[in-house]
Amino acid sequence: MFGPFWDKAQTIRTSEDWLNRAGWLGDSPQGSSEWYNPIVMSKMSLLHDASIYNSFDTDNFVWIDGGITNTINYNLLIEERFFDKLEKYLDPFLFVQYPYPYYGQGVKEVHGFEWEALNRMAGGTVEWICRGGLFGGNKEAIKEVNSYYWHLLNDSLNEGFMGTEESLFSILAEKYPELCRATRIGINGHIQEFVQKALDD
């Protein structure tokens, strides 16, 4: 899955140019662990694979991070009404976005991804960042978004740019707004806000 991109990702991760884009990068998981980005950047393919195997013969698929209950009360996620109400947000593909707190404040990267390059690849100014802890859609949309995602990953790594999956999701949401239906939450970026929003809808 990530194999063809491994060497490029490690070259960027260990380069002085990338590490110097922000003081925190070197000590962050994506900077200090060779496995962090290959794993989180493979979420889209894992979701796509699940939609192909489709063991439950369903139309919609959602990625939920295994550790998401560190920030969301698990009782909300086992609430049957949530999954019933979630369905309408998955048409065609859901990203949950929060306003980038450093937008317009001179910060030159988003999760390590160079800001100007991110906007150029998005074809517009990215003011909202997509969360990677919960996303999904219908089978057809997942197939399309997955294709765009891996082309974008390839192009960005070839140009020497790397953030996390959230950087790439944010580009896709800006570039393909009719396909990637963004639902916005507050500046803290906690997905629990979206879960509660869906429950209250």
Identify the residue ranges that each predicted region occupies.
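Structured loops at beta-to-helix junctions and adjacent beta-edge loops in soluble globular domains
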Residues: 50, 96-99, 138, 172
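Active-site-proximal specificity loops/subdomain of glycosyltransferases
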Residues: 1-55
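Catalytic core and acceptor-binding pocket of nucleotide-sugar-dependent glycosyltransferases
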Residues: 68-70, 74, 114-201
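Short aromatic-enriched loop/helix-cap "lid" or pocket-rim segments at secondary-structure transitions
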Residues: 8-11, 74-76, 107-109
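Short beta-strand-to-loop element that shapes/binds the nucleotide-sugar donor at the catalytic cleft/hinge
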Residues: 92-109
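GT-A fold catalytic core of metal-dependent nucleotide-sugar glycosyltransferases
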Residues: 39-97
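Surface-exposed flexible segments
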Residues: 54-60, 106-117
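A short acidic, often aromatic-flanked loop/helix-cap motif at beta-alpha or helix-coil junctions
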Residues: 2-10, 102-104, 188-192
